[in-house]
């Protein structure tokens, strides 16, 4: 469990690291599509997790699938973008206390998160994927092995319960991949998109973990969302409408393709929550 003191310390570091993604990107005659309020007037403040290809920092700006959607939102609502780095554990408190307007990083739509904060409409689907030298693809393959995953994923508790398995939980996908590459893990479990990025330039094999009731997350692809401040109803509505429009006109599929996800990832179906 993350200590409260750790969260507060992380928050202090985050606030000092917050930066602007643009000096003057909003035209003087820009007219917003919606009447939204933000933590800082005229600015969309983003909590950015380091989880490529969903969200990451590149050239001191937000990047990734979720970030590209937010750039479109900022343009539509005449907002500058400022961002700060957050871990998954610190992102929800940051949103709920109003330090940021929105947090991004392929957050799965879980019942627990829905009780804590506002989830955007589903963005895309993601699947639990295994990276390994030996092509592991089943839960049985993982038993007795040293495996790792990223904090905040809905399958963490299920993996902890696997008998004889040594599970290590990491703050982000980069740290997870580094330990796999260093030989400290037999397998790394991540979302499909993140695993694809991590495996580039390596000999690791990727496999979507086969359905198994011991890990319920394998039974249905998870929908992802952004986290929005619970009181920012207008902002949440504007984001949901934009996502719907981007899905209809093909912009969302284009963004997914640019970051290595298949077109089918945009086929989210009806909004749902997983436990």
Name each region found by the language model.
Residues 14-17:
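C-terminal motif of bacterial Sec signal peptides marking the signal peptidase cleavage site
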Residues 106-115, 186-220:
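A ligand-binding cleft/hinge motif common to bilobed small-molecule-binding domains
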Residues 19, 67-77, 143-146, 153, ...:
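Extended ligand-binding regions for polar small-molecule ligands
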Residues 20-26, 157-171, 175, 206-210, ...:
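Ligand-binding clefts/hinges and TM-proximal coupling segments of bilobed small-molecule sensing domains
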Residues 26-106:
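Extracytoplasmic small-molecule ligand-binding "clamshell" domains
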Residues 45, 49-53, 62-75, 107-108, ...:
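Bilobed "Venus flytrap"/periplasmic-binding protein-like clamshell domains
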Residues 124-129, 202-240, 263-275:
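Periplasmic-binding protein-like
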Residues 80-142:
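Acidic, polar ligand-binding/catalytic clefts
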């Amino acid at each position: 469990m993350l200590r409260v003191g750790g969260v507060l310390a992380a928050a202090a570091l985050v606030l000092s690291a917050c930066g602007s993604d643009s000096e003057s990107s909003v035209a003087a005659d820009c007219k917003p599509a919606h009447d939204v309020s933000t933590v800082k007037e005229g600015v969309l403040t983003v909590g950015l997790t380091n989880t490529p290809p969903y969200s990451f920092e590149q050239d001191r700006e937000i990047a990734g699938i979720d970030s590209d959607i937010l750039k479109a939102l900022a343009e539509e609502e005449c907002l500058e973008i400022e961002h700060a780095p957050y871990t998954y554990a610190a992102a929800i408190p940051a949103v709920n206390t109003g330090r940021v307007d929105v947090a991004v990083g392929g957050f799965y739509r879980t019942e627990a998160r829905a009780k804590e904060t506002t989830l955007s409409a589903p963005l895309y689907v993601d699947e639990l994927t295994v990276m390994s030298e030996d092509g592991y693809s089943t839960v049985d393959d993982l038993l007795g092995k040293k495996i790792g995953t990223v904090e905040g994923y809905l399958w963490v508790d299920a993996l902890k319960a696997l008998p004889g398995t040594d599970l290590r939980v990491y703050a982000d996908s980069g740290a997870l991949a580094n330990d796999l590459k260093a030989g400290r893990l037999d397998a790394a479990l991540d979302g499909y998109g993140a695993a694809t990025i991590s495996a580039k330039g390596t000999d690791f094999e990727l496999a979507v973990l086969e359905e198994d009731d011991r890990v319920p997350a394998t039974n249905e692809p998870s929908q992802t969302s952004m986290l929005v401040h619970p009181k920012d109803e207008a902002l949440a509505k504007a984001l949901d409408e934009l996502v719907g429009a981007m899905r209809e006109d093909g912009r969302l599929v284009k963004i997914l393709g640019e970051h290595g996800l298949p077109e089918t990832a945009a086929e989210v179906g009806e909004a749902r929550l997983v436990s």
